């Protein structure tokens, strides 16, 4: 089965074609991604209206390129899949409407894919990973620990109660006057800094719950920087190094508890695995910390290639292909969802916002 996938949930416009054979093995036939970094850089973050307009301007030619790169015509694909949520509603509308139109014109089945499910299943495309396994999703919009039991069978073990990790990186970079996107900028500066200079907090470290929290760490960075104004270059590099070390330590504690939970629930699993996905997974320091953690706990550490860790359409096409193997197509009446939990059975997680408790 060959599936055309479309991804427009945030600030990457993407189209791809993936093939899934009868044995469940996958192959990427094409994977085209157009980043909007240049459009959003002047604002220091993603502007939803600009993102939606950029998707609308670029998506048709990206679909054409994906088909050309795969050597296929539209009628030769077997299904069309698109991200239906979660994400920025304007971008989701652009991708979903385009995918529905293509599916209707070519008379092909249509699959509405949860963006998080795309990340959750990528390791099955790249590594043929069997169920069950653990997924750590760390991106600008999400920080979650998910138990993946099967297609559509997910349990959220932990999530952030305030800020996503990628957001904490971006806000730290902006505070320190570093360029957008913030994650790579902080990582570059941290290479030259002293991670022991500032004693930044490790939120929730030592607690039995498996959730994450990064707002307190972000606040500590702001307070530290404010006390040092005017900042020297060395101050900036040391803050970045201390921030990154605190994140690595926090992740190791939170994820380590999830690894123990997995071994308790699946004591007979021959090859327990931790999959790391999302843009923050590109950070070499964090990857090294998690890889060492997996080695100590007897887990395989799996991180898909960088171009498949960040937002892309190959993961959406693959998730559509996995669903097509076992499920009926979705209706063309399906609507985009800006919020769409991967595990809808889980109770809401309550954190603290400016106006008090929030879900």
UniProtKB/Swiss-Prot annotation:
Query: What is its EC class?
Result: transferase
Where does this protein hold Fe cation?
Answer: 115, 119, 311
The cofactor note reads:
Binds 1 Fe(2+) ion per subunit.
Keyword list, A-Z: Acyltransferase, Cytoplasm, Iron, Metal-binding, Transferase, tRNA processing
Mention any one GO cellular component term assigned to this protein in its UniProt record.
cytoplasm
Q: Which GO terms describe its biological process?
A: tRNA threonylcarbamoyladenosine modification
Name of one Pfam family that matches: TsaD
**Catalysed reaction per UniProt?**
L-threonylcarbamoyladenylate + adenosine(37) in tRNA = N(6)-L-threonylcarbamoyladenosine(37) in tRNA + AMP + H(+)
Q: Where does substrate bind?
A: 137-141, 170, 183, 283
Q: Where is this region: Disordered?
A: 328-359
InterPro entries, from UniProt? Answer: ATPase_NBD, Gcp-like_dom, KAE1/TsaD, TsaD
EC nos:
2.3.1.234
The cofactor required is: Fe(2+)
Q: What does the UniProt record say this protein does?
A: Required for the formation of a threonylcarbamoyl group on adenosine at position 37 (t(6)A37) in tRNAs that read codons beginning with adenine. Is involved in the transfer of the threonylcarbamoyl moiety of threonylcarbamoyl-AMP (TC-AMP) to the N6 group of A37, together with TsaE and TsaB. TsaD likely plays a direct catalytic role in this reaction.
In its UniProt entry, what is this protein called?
tRNA N6-adenosine threonylcarbamoyltransferase
What organism is listed for this UniProt entry? Answer: Brucella ovis (strain ATCC 25840 / 63/290 / NCTC 10512)
């Amino acid at each position: 089965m060959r599936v055309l996938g479309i991804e427009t949930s945030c600030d990457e416009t993407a189209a791809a074609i993936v093939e899934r054979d009868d044995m469940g093995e996958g192959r990427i036939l094409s994977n085209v991604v157009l980043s909007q970094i240049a459009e959003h850089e002047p604002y220091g973050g993603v502007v939803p209206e600009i993102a939606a307009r950029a998707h609308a301007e670029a998506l048709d030619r990206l679909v054409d390129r994906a088909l050309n790169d795969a050597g296929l015509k539209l009628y030769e694909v077997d299904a069309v899949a698109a991200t239906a949520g979660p994400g920025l509603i304007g971008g989701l509308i652009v991708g979903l409407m385009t995918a529905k139109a293509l599916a209707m014109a070519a008379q092909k089945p249509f699959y509405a894919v949860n963006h998080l499910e795309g990340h959750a299943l990528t390791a099955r495309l790249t590594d043929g990973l069997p169920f069950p396994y653990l997924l750590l999703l760390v991106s600008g919009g999400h920080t979650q620990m998910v138990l993946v039991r099967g297609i559509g069978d997910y349990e959220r073990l932990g999530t952030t109660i305030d800020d996503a990790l990628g957001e904490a990186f971006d806000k730290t970079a902006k505070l320190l006057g570093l360029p957008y996107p913030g994650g790579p900028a902080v990582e570059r500066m941290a290479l030259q800094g002293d991670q022991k200079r500032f004693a930044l907090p490790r939120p929730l470290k030592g607690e039995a719950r498996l959730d994450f929290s990064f707002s307190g760490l972000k606040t500590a960075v702001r307070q530290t920087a404010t006390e040092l104004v005017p900042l020297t270059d060395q101050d900036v590099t040391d803050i970045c190094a201390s921030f990154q070390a605190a994140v690595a330590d926090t992740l190791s504690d939170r994820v380590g508890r999830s690894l123990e939970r997995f071994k308790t629930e699946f004591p007979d699993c021959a090859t327990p695995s931790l999959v790391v996905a999302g843009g923050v997974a590109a950070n070499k320091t964090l990857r090294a910390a998690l890889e060492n953690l997996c080695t100590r706990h007897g887990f395989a550490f799996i991180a898909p290639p960088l171009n498949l860790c960040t937002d892309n359409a190959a993961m959406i096409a693959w998730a559509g292909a996995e669903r097509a193997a076992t499920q009926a197509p979705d209706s063309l009446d399906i609507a985009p969802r800006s919020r769409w939990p991967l595990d809808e059975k889980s109770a809401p997680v309550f954190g603290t916002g400016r106006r008090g408790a929030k879900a």
